[in-house]
Amino acid sequence: MPRPPKCRWVRSEPNVTHFKPVGVPMSMLDEVILTVEELEAIRLKDLEGLEQEECAEMMKVSRPTFFRIINSARQKVADALVNGKAIRVEGGNYRVYDEDQRGHRGMRHRHGQWGRED
């Protein structure tokens, strides 16, 4: 039996959760689902320009785990861009931390859908 996945830490839940090509109705598009932790990995590495080791520390995962998360995220984004698919950000196994409080206070645990607390 596989070990249950550990929660990844993310700074915040995304404000925007859907992206799609202009001029094509959503009903005609295939969709790629990007998890919240995959979006966080892209934010840390590609937007903030942090080293993978720093990103892994911030998300509280090992470097190999971060590498797998960022590779999965990049593959999904590339698929959506090249093949004209919509991107929906949802789900995953993560914790949201307050910028000022990285301890257990100020953290909310999320798994799967928005608003479902464990």
Curated annotation (Swiss-Prot):
It comes from the Bacteria. Signal peptide: none annotated. Pfam families: DUF134. SUPFAM superfamilies: Sigma3 and sigma4 domains of RNA polymerase sigma factors. HAMAP family: UPF0251. InterPro entries: RNA_pol_sigma_r3/r4-like (IPR013324), UPF0251 (IPR002852), WH-like_DNA-bd_sf (IPR036388). The lineage of its organism: Bacteria, Bacillati, Bacillota, Clostridia, Thermoanaerobacterales. Belongs to the UPF0251 family. Coiled coil: none annotated. This is UPF0251 protein Teth39_0655.
